[in-house]
Every structure is written in C-alpha cells, then in structure tokens.
Amino acid sequence: MKKKHKRLLITSGIFCFLSCAVFFILTTLKENISFFYTVSEAIVLPNNQKPIRVGGMIVENSVIRSESEVIFQMTDFNKSVMVKYQGILPPMFSEKSGVVVQGKMFDNGTFLADTVFAKHDENYKPKVLK
C-alpha cells in the first residue's frame, strides 16, 4: 500500500471515530442538559402536554399556601403565569426570587408544576452571614 493511500485510510478512520464520539456525546448531553423557557415563551408554546421547564421571578405578595398546595405568580417582567404546586418547596423559595418550575402548561394560562427549583446567584451566603 502506498503512503498516500495509507495516510488517507488513517485520516478517514480518525474522522469516522471522532464523528461517532461527538454524536454520542451530544446525544448523551441532550438527555441531561436542562434548558428552560421564559414565561413569555412558555405561554405561546403549543399545548402538547409535554413537561417543560419555565424560569422566572416570583411575584411579590402572590404566594398562597394551603395544606395541600402552593399557588404563586411567576413573571419574566413581560408576562406572568399562575403556578400550582403540591409538594415541599425548596428552602430558598421566597417572593421576589428566581425559580424554575417543571411541569405542564394548560390553555387557561395555569402551570401545574411537578418540581420547583429555587434559583440563586453564585454568591450564596447563609442567612447567618447576611
């Protein structure tokens, strides 16, 4: 086999290997990366009953707690949506703070959350230090 053919074969093999590796890495990341929509984006999405994630800020004086559920308004400062959630809220959940909710959006503008994640900045300090 000539040097030129051998080099072409090795280059082709490396290219195929790298292409397969990139494909598998991206496929795995797609399943694990957690993107979220803004409230404005989520409202205009077609209602296909697939779970989505929506991020925004909790509107001040909107949190209503009962024994079985928590209802609050979430906004992206353009539009807002009412969120209903049954379960234990994260410790950092508070009004005027960031939140990401995972669940389903309904046609009436209500979001039924399965999971609530409290967002915070990278400079988190415990309440003791504040």
Swiss-Prot record:
<dbReference type="GO" id="GO:0017004">
    <property type="term" value="P:cytochrome complex assembly"/>
</dbReference>
<feature type="topological domain" description="Cytoplasmic">
    <location>
        <begin position="1"/>
        <end position="7"/>
    </location>
</feature>
<keyword id="KW-0812">Transmembrane</keyword>
<keyword id="KW-0472">Membrane</keyword>
<keyword id="KW-0735">Signal-anchor</keyword>
<dbReference type="InterPro" id="IPR012340">
    <property type="entry name" value="NA-bd_OB-fold"/>
</dbReference>
<keyword id="KW-0349">Heme</keyword>
<feature type="topological domain" description="Extracellular">
    <location>
        <begin position="29"/>
        <end position="130"/>
    </location>
</feature>
<protein>
    <recommendedName>
        <fullName>Cytochrome c-type biogenesis protein CcmE</fullName>
    </recommendedName>
</protein>
<dbReference type="InterPro" id="IPR036127">
    <property type="entry name" value="CcmE-like_sf"/>
</dbReference>
<keyword id="KW-0479">Metal-binding</keyword>
<comment type="similarity">
    <text>Belongs to the CcmE/CycJ family.</text>
</comment>
<keyword id="KW-1003">Cell membrane</keyword>
<feature type="binding site" description="covalent">
    <location>
        <position position="120"/>
    </location>
    <ligand>
        <name>heme</name>
    </ligand>
</feature>
<dbReference type="Pfam" id="PF03100">
    <property type="entry name" value="CcmE"/>
</dbReference>
<dbReference type="GO" id="GO:0046872">
    <property type="term" value="F:metal ion binding"/>
</dbReference>
<comment type="function">
    <text>Heme chaperone required for the biogenesis of c-type cytochromes. Transiently binds heme delivered by CcmC and transfers the heme to apo-cytochromes in a process facilitated by CcmF and CcmH.</text>
</comment>
<feature type="transmembrane region" description="Helical; Signal-anchor for type II membrane protein">
    <location>
        <begin position="8"/>
        <end position="28"/>
    </location>
</feature>
<keyword id="KW-0408">Iron</keyword>
<dbReference type="InterPro" id="IPR004329">
    <property type="entry name" value="CcmE"/>
</dbReference>
<dbReference type="GO" id="GO:0020037">
    <property type="term" value="F:heme binding"/>
</dbReference>
<feature type="binding site" description="axial binding residue">
    <location>
        <position position="124"/>
    </location>
    <ligand>
        <name>heme</name>
    </ligand>
</feature>
<keyword id="KW-1133">Transmembrane helix</keyword>
<keyword id="KW-0201">Cytochrome c-type biogenesis</keyword>
<dbReference type="GO" id="GO:0005886">
    <property type="term" value="C:plasma membrane"/>
</dbReference>
